[in-house]
Amino acid sequence: IIAGINISNTFKLLKTITNNDVLTIEINSKEFMDIEITSESKKTSTKFQLKLLDINESRIEVPDVNMTSVTILPSADFQRLCRDMSNIGNDIEITRAGKELRLRCEGDFANQETSIECPDESPEMTGLYSLRYLNIFTKATSMCSSVQIMQEEGNRFLILKYNVANLGELKFYMATKVPEDQ
């Protein structure tokens, strides 16, 4: 089944989930996705009907890519950094080199660079990404305590991977921005 959902709206509904709640997702029509959150301890059940987006249903195959660098950060810290940097600029430069991850942005009134020490070595790779979309993706923070920032040597894209308890994983793929002069 291919279903188009607005990630931002979906997270607005799912952020009420607690650790012991049961989440049920069903798609019975092309217009709505039914979401039910059940709490045994509170003896409550909340139902939502999320409107589905009308999308092109052709399948897009994501190629297998060897991700050269995997950096694990607390998801709340990464979300805060992205949110803070979006107050300064529109784009973030993510560089992994050696045992360091650097997050950098430039704006009209200020620049920011944050360096994070990493436990393992990595070849140098840099990519430029939209903070607008990263801030949407980091809304998955409420579902997972850590995020894996995955980069590949070709710098074609970035993957943010959230392992959601024993339910599975969320992966967000983001294309690297190409500078306007190229």
Task: Locate the predicted segments by residue.
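DNA polymerase processivity clamps
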Residues: 1-46, 69-182
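Conserved loop-to-helix interface motifs that mediate assembly, gating, or partner/ligand docking
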Residues: 37-62
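Short, recurring structural edge motifs at helix starts
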Residues: 63-68
